[in-house]
């Protein structure tokens, strides 16, 4: 904190700056803004004696444009637009000062504590309310600041009143003692604004001549010109020296509060030719509120005493804080014309115009191979640029699709089109100049980059990788240097996209727990004409890769399932390789996903090139299998040819998979995260869930395999709302939300994977159910463990982050290892905090296992017992023994000290290199002491001492009187002082060299200590990851137990029976409820229902595998079908279900054809979507599948729809014989299958009151009860009445329906009679049926 005296000094300096030097400093958070300007105190006594100009009387005239009580937007220099009320000055009784363009209006700023001031009429705009389009994003008055939003609320309230009432809001009546000084400043500002042309000419003097002072301000300090911010001088790269305490030019130019990074402006750089390099003050706009300014001035009502003029030295220091001459350049991003010029400079460049752009290979935009990620920048243009801007264009030309965050000192600068993006998307403001320029501090990078990435932008972080001293040394070592060499090196250290976020130390922490996959896909047809996919996808925050290759059907069913289970946020594909069907999936199902095409060969590598790069780059050197001698991970090795021991030849059915991996590796390499992710060697082979689902496989053998999973494709997950709802895409109302009470992020991710692929093996399912029962049997432990789990951080991501920091590969040649960060200490502290957080997390895991081991012996579940049993105690235990390792890390270094200082000093015995260096230092120092004692005895003088520092240490200082004797010849005179001489010997030089070497080794070990510490921790990664996996499973099991205990209404343990070949599959649910719906729309309790398929119910119904469901519109048919689907998923997940009885044989796949929607982005109509989904069912369904079909055929003509529905029912019921719920409103279909043994009829019951020919008189009460038999009508006119269809239309429709019914019935009677005449049927039943049909006419 600043002392009161320092603050007082700075306040007085501010007054002088404001009244005399026209300096514009931010007033918000004064202490933070001025914390780096304390050096002003050295000359403040000289500054505060500057005479203050006398007040100039104002010419008062009434404009007539505005009147008291008007509401306006007002803008003062350095402040955002602010809602104001115009009212008469409390002492002058007028609203206007001056006349013409120099007139100023008196306003009160709306705020919690209102303030007032005079504002130039040029900077007033009528206030039209907070709903005005100029207030919205992109408008002139748009702001994200809560203060301005609050001010708009007050202004909106004032708008509803008349002017008389509004004037009662004017509460600022006391005149300010410093008001006249403020007015003088505003006069100068207005004069400057009106004379921009003169100032701009002076500013753009390319020869750097002295600035000509204004005649009216002779006392104003003469200054060298400060050039526009589009210039980059060699000195601009000298401003950042983290190890130098004295403020640099960059720091001196930045009087901003970095915590308010949204509106921070970046500093300007002078060009190389400027004779005096004066960095201009970093202007802060849209930050301070007028109220703060006024309150600051009121605190200092007395003006400084008049005294001698300020000295030249003081003036030169004050120029460091000079504001740009024209604040009009800070204008809205969307209108270049409001910035004092027609367009931004980059908008005028011909080679940047649409239609004229070329890529780096000079291919135009209409060329088929045009690369939009690169840009051709003419060489003659680059030669005209300053060194810094030339480097920016070089980087931009290779990353044209990225927003370049260009490090200058401690700020990230955005230039040209990137600056416009920053203003539009981040709310930054432009700097002065004719070209777009904005920026933010280093500390704000994580927050701002996350916003841009979330909006789909690609970010390129460019760091300064050379200090000014290093640059000078490089230039000296180079024979011929140009001005382009005399600039510090800057390199791209990271490219961040939505699919490549790793949440490093400089990035912000993740806000979401779910996986974000980067998917790479390659496609081709095999020799049989079948579609084949090669895929590779990775969650970069965890570092786990999935690689696989599979064949697919014409509907791309497996690929659709993949993207549903592992939803990518970014997709890479080979340009010109994808089929139309795959492109439709990318444009339809993955429309919100970022998609990027890679060029075949150079970017999307072949399988052979991929293997070659993986071996050459030595990504897996640390993980090399010493026994087999294999460098490649086992999963990658399995994809190579068995005949090639080197692993350079792809396997027969693995070329596409390895090529897709190559696309991923290329992209990770481009984003500069290939080393940290691939060196984890965390690969898993992707095998489609339905890979072995074949109709010829014995059902008992199939379900006996523990690795079998239920297949839930993307359509089913969407229709049943398992992961996200169909309304807004969130988890609200989904099965995931209902059962997810996981406490850890990695547990939540695992639960989602379990939901996407429930178990099929009854033994495994029952073991999970046993685990749920075991946990429910120890409620006290359940509560205790829950509290422990809540303390765990996201250890899965932390382990990946620790590996990245400790990676030797990254430390050797990654640009980030050379980057110079201003906030290095802050980042070091964050690294240590993350590491200590991981250690604490594993300690908590140990406590969890200790607590569970006390009751583990009573557990029936094998999986639960294995999770909480240590390997060392039982051979079946899975949890690693971490106690010894954790104790080792507890004593490795002082945790509290490291957390405070950001520096790790290892304790003895932990770091061999550091310990050896310390031991050598100690040994040499002891040798020095021994040698000194020896020399004392030799000379007979006890007063001989060592003297010196650094490399001149250990000079023996001998009294001059003693040197007159014969000294040994080996003594070499090094220095003298009065009465003494100092000597070295060869022995001393040798020992000193040893000491310096040991000290250098110690310092190097200490400097690299954190990385090596993380690296050593990562060596035990297998145990750490195993522990995380065990606790993740425990967390999910506890989540299932919580639902099983706290679910609404009665819940039961499902009974899963292994199917018998002689018996049909069945599903039996008694009094079952929808798991996500506890109340009806009207607030009543949910009505439970029985669903029996494939077995007889209590009423003795048939064992039909297909149930035809009818009932009134809105009667609950779709809900019943969704309920059945969700309950079987829960049962095979290993969770209790909301029912009194749940018995079933395992279901291998759930199919759904629910709802009605088109795929407009894929060019598919509603009916086509229906038939596509139905086709997939008919192709892939087995007798062990569950099929849910809702109103098939409604998307086409009635007869066509009826025919298709009838054929599908017959196929499902008589051929496939799978468990089916088929809802329909085609009552002819019901009649056709009423006598079929393979089909059972059921309907949602309803009660009809006042049934009559007039539908308006009927009252339908939905009972939501599923009962045996068919429903006679669909009562569609009741739904029409509930939807407020006009009564007249309903009546007409009812009459028309009667006509259709009669015609249809007549036709059916005619056909029946024809059959009787032909002798096809003529029994008593036929006669009875004919009689019934006639009664309906």
Curated annotation (Swiss-Prot):
Gene Ontology CC annotations of this record: MutSalpha complex; nucleus
GO terms of molecular function: ATP binding; ATP-dependent DNA damage sensor activity; mismatched DNA binding
InterPro entries, alphabetized: DNA_mismatch_repair_MutS-lik_N, DNA_mismatch_repair_MutS/MSH, DNA_mismatch_repair_MutS_C, DNA_mismatch_repair_MutS_clamp, DNA_mismatch_repair_MutS_core, DNA_mismatch_repair_MutS_N, DNA_mismatch_repair_MutS_sf, DNA_mmatch_repair_MutS_con_dom
The PWWP domain, residue ranges: 68-130
SMART domains: MUTSac, MUTSd, PWWP
Localisation per UniProt entry: Nucleus
Composition bias, Basic and acidic residues: 226-248, 294-305
Region (Disordered): 170-310
Acidic residues: bias regions: 176-187, 257-272
Keyword DNA damage carried by entry: yes
Record's function text: Component of the post-replicative DNA mismatch repair system (MMR). Involved in B cell growth by positively regulating B cell proliferation and controlling replication efficiency. Controls cell cycle to prevent re-replication and defects in DNA damage-induced G2 checkpoint. Doesn't seem to counteract or control the immunoglobulin gene conversion (Ig GC) and to contribute to guanine/uracil mismatch repair.
PANTHER family: DNA MISMATCH REPAIR PROTEIN MSH6 (PTHR11361:SF148), DNA MISMATCH REPAIR PROTEIN MUTS FAMILY MEMBER (PTHR11361)
Record NCBIfam families: PRK05399.1 (NF003810)
Protein name as annotated: DNA mismatch repair protein Msh6
Organism per entry: Gallus gallus (Chicken)
